[in-house]
Amino acid sequence: EYSSKTFISSKENIVRTHLFLILLIGFCYGQLFELNHDNDTRIYWVDYPDNATEPTPLVISMHGRNQSLLSHITYSQMSNFANPQNIAVVYPQGINSSGLLAWNTGVWWDNSEYDDVGYLNAIIDSVISNFAIDTNRIYACGMSNGGFMAYELACELSDRIVAFGSVAGNFMMNV
C-alpha cells in the first residue's frame, strides 16, 4: 500500500540512485557540464577519449522521450565504441515537458518555449571551447524522440553538423 510518505521516500531513493550512478560514471569516464540557455540551467555529459593526440570528431547522441542522458549512456553504449576510436561523445539532456524529459520536436511536444536547437548549438560551442574537436567532423544521432531531434538538427544546423542518424525516430513533416 502506497502513501504520500512512501512515494516521497521512493522518489528520494531514485534521486539518490541517479546521483550515485552519475558519480560512479564520473570515476570511470566523462564529465558532467551545466549550461545556462534561455534562463534554464541544463546539463550534458562529455566523454572525451583519454588518448586523443589531435582534434577528435564529435558525436552528439540524444536520448528518447522519457529517458535521460544517464539512461542513454547506459543503453546506447556509444562511448564503448567511440572512445577507442578517438571520438568524443556528448550526451545532452532534454527538457522536462509534462513530467517527461523530451526534445522540443515530434508529435508529443506541447511546449514551444524551449529552443533545443539553440541549446544544442550552444553545447557544440562549449565542447569546442573545452576540448580539441575537429569542427569538420561533428555528427548527431538519437533514439526515438532524440532521432526526431537529429532530423531537426539536419535542417537547422547543417552548416555545423556533417551527418545525422536516427534510430526509431521518424522525420516529422513540420521540420
Locate each region found by the language model:
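Serine-hydrolase catalytic machinery in alpha/beta-hydrolase-like enzymes
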Residues: 35-48, 54-139, 152, 156
